[in-house]
Curated annotation (Swiss-Prot):
TM annotation in the entry: none
Keywords: Activator, Calcium, Cytoplasm, DNA-binding, Phosphoprotein, Repressor, Sporulation, Transcription, Transcription regulation, Two-component regulatory system
One Gene Ontology molecular-function label: DNA-binding transcription factor activity
Biological process annotations from GO: detection of stimulus; phosphorelay signal transduction system; regulation of sporulation resulting in formation of a cellular spore; sporulation resulting in formation of a cellular spore
Compartment list: Cytoplasm
Record domain Response regulatory: where: 1-59
Main localization of the protein described in the UniProt heading: cytoplasm
Name under which the protein is recorded: Stage 0 sporulation protein A homolog
Cofactor binding annotation: Binds 1 Ca(2+) ion per subunit.
GO cellular component, one term: cytoplasm
Job of this protein: May play the central regulatory role in sporulation. It may be an element of the effector pathway responsible for the activation of sporulation genes in response to nutritional stress. Spo0A may act in concert with spo0H (a sigma factor) to control the expression of some genes that are critical to the sporulation process.
């Protein structure tokens, strides 16, 4: 945040694109980083493929902070335990499935820092894509999530509960 504050005091001709990789996922800090001019904010651990995709999107189509400062922020969530906040205007891209799922989980009140959060989000995404998984939660859903996150099905179940 200190670097962002310093950048804001400098009289730069062209504002650099700023991507923040952090271990801190607190809403206040994330929002402050975006307010200070960060283009993207992601919390570790994150999916490198999704992160690379977001960076490419940012440099191919995203406006600068100054161009979009009057418009509201869009939150985009990859399928890992991280999330990326961007200052892109909402009208540029439609709300995707990941964002919708994360918003609903947040509304319910599940805190993002708990281990079960990422498992729950992954489970919902998988069920949306294949409703048959609902009839085999302990036999197929939990084991497939466990495999993806290199853990056991019982740990996935316990963390979600």
């Amino acid at each position: 945040l200190g670097v962002l504050e310093k950048l804001n005091t400098m009289d730069l001709e062209k504002t650099p694109r700023i991507i923040i990789l952090s271990a801190v996922g607190q809403d206040k800090i994330t929002q402050q980083a975006i307010t200070l001019g960060a283009d993207y904010y992601t919390v570790k651990p994150f999916d490198m493929e999704v992160f690379t995709k977001r960076i490419r999107e940012m440099f191919n189509s995203a406006p600068t902070i100054q161009e979009s400062s009057a418009q509201s922020n869009r939150v985009s969530y990859p399928t890992t335990s991280s999330y990326i906040l961007t200052s892109e205007p909402k009208s540029k891209t439609p709300v995707d499935l990941e964002t919708e799922i994360t918003n609903i989980i947040h509304e319910i009140g599940v805190p993002a820092h708990i281990k079960g959060y990422m498992y729950l989000r992954e489970a919902i995404t998988m069920v949306v894509n294949d409703m048959e998984l609902l009839s085999a939660v302990t036999k197929e859903l939990y084991p497939s999530i466990a495999k993806k996150y290199n853990t056991t099905a019982s740990r996935v179940e316990r963390a979600i509960r």
